Amino acid sequence: MLGVVELLLLGTAWLAGPARGQNETEPIVLEGKCLVVCDSNPTSDPTGTALGISVRSGSAKVAFSAIRSTNHEPSEMSNRTMIIYFDQVLVNIGNNFDSERSTFIAPRKGIYSFNFHVVKVYNRQTIQVSLMLNGWPVISAFAGDQDVTREAASNGVLIQMEKGDRAYLKLERGNLMGGWKYSTFSGFLVFPL
């Protein structure tokens, strides 16, 4: 007697026409989607007869990387919000980085990776940069050596985000006048939840 999974697979194959992988580990591509057949709970089925199904599409890819391409003085807007703005987007797969606000908006619940590198130049003040999640600081980095002409505040983290959550960089302390060039802000979806 056929189980639900076997009937689903037969029904899908019948609707899509013939689709064969060369071996059991190759995915079967049906109408642009990748159908992956795997054991959904290997510890509960020592015989290896249970099957689980996972369907993924290319739209699951999420990544961005933005930089400051020029030195400039902070704008009136950035002086009010203290958000660090990035004027050149190098990568924006999924279009979830809002370049006007320099804010990443999570398209789905998942684990995300973020890293930043904010450079201060010829500035004797200590700077503190924070990665903000919905207005709350998650991690911070400092650059405060008064004897060097260039120094960076850098950090990275994995965080769980819900759909619609916002992440951005905020200057919590100091100023970046005269040296934003070479600063970067990047992130990507590690895996959805």
Curated annotation (Swiss-Prot):
Expressed and secreted by presynaptic neurons, such as cerebellar granule cells. Following secretion, the protein binds to GRID2 on the postsynaptic Purkinje cell membranes. Expressed at the highest level in the cerebellar cortex. High levels are also seen in the olfactory bulb, posterior part of the cerebral cortex, certain thalamic nuclei, and deep cerebellar nuclei. Low to moderate levels are detected in some hypothalamic and brainstem nuclei. In the thalamus, expressed in parafascicular nucleus neurons and other regions (at protein level). Keywords: Cell membrane, Disulfide bond, Glycoprotein, Membrane, Postsynaptic cell membrane, Secreted, Sialic acid, Signal, Synapse. One of its GO terms (cellular component) is glutamatergic synapse. The proteolytic processing to yield cerebellin seems to occur either prior to the secretion by presynaptic neurons and subsequent oligomerization or in some other location after release of the mature protein. In the cerebellum, cerebellin is much more abundant than [des-Ser1]-cerebellin. SMART domains: C1Q. Pfam families: C1q (PF00386). GO terms for biological process: cerebellar granule cell differentiation; establishment of localization in cell; heterophilic cell-cell adhesion via plasma membrane cell adhesion molecules; maintenance of synapse structure; negative regulation of excitatory postsynaptic potential; negative regulation of inhibitory synapse assembly; positive regulation of long-term synaptic depression; positive regulation of synapse assembly. Residues 1-21 form the signal peptide. Disruption phenotype: Mice (reeler, weaver and staggerer) show defects in granule cell migration and parallel fiber formation, synaptogenesis, Purkinje cell dendritic maturation and establishment of adult cytoarchitecture show a correlation between the formation and number of parallel fiber-Purkinje cell synapses and cerebellin levels. CBLN1 single knockout mice show a major impairment in motor behaviors. Double CBLN1 and CBLN2 knockout mice exhibit gait abnormalities, impairments in balance and coordination and develop seizures. It is found in: Secreted; Postsynaptic cell membrane. Changing residue 112 to H: Retention in the endoplasmic reticulum/cis-Golgi. Glycans are attached at residues 23, 79. Residues 62-193 are annotated as: Necessary for interaction with CBLN3, and homotrimerization. InterPro entries: C1q_dom, Cerebellin_Synaptic_Org, Tumour_necrosis_fac-like_dom. GO terms for molecular function: identical protein binding. Residues 34-38 are annotated as: Essential for interaction with NRXN1 and linker of two C1q trimers into disulfide-linked hexamers. Residues 57-193 form the C1q domain. Residues 122-147 are annotated as: Essential for interaction with GRID2. The keyword Zinc does not apply. Required for synapse integrity and synaptic plasticity. During cerebellar synapse formation, essential for the matching and maintenance of pre- and post-synaptic elements at parallel fiber-Purkinje cell synapses, the establishment of the proper pattern of climbing fiber-Purkinje cell innervation, and induction of long-term depression at parallel fiber-Purkinje cell synapses. Plays a role as a synaptic organizer that acts bidirectionally on both pre- and post-synaptic components. The cerebellin peptide exerts neuromodulatory functions. Directly stimulates norepinephrine release via the adenylate cyclase/PKA-dependent signaling pathway; and indirectly enhances adrenocortical secretion in vivo, through a paracrine mechanism involving medullary catecholamine release. Homohexamer; disulfide-linked homotrimers. The trimers are assembled via the globular C1q domains. The trimers associate via N-terminal cysteine residues to form disulfide-linked hexamers. May form oligomers with CBLN2, CBLN3 and CBLN4 prior to secretion. Once secreted, does not interact with other CBLN family members. Interacts with GRID1. Interacts with NRXN1 and NRXN2 long (alpha) and short (beta) isoforms produced by alternative promoter usage. Competes with NLGN1 for NRXN1-binding. Weakly interacts with NRXN3 short isoform and not at all with NRXN3 long isoform. This is Cerebellin-1. The lineage of its organism: Eukaryota, Metazoa, Chordata, Craniata, Vertebrata. The gene is Cbln1.
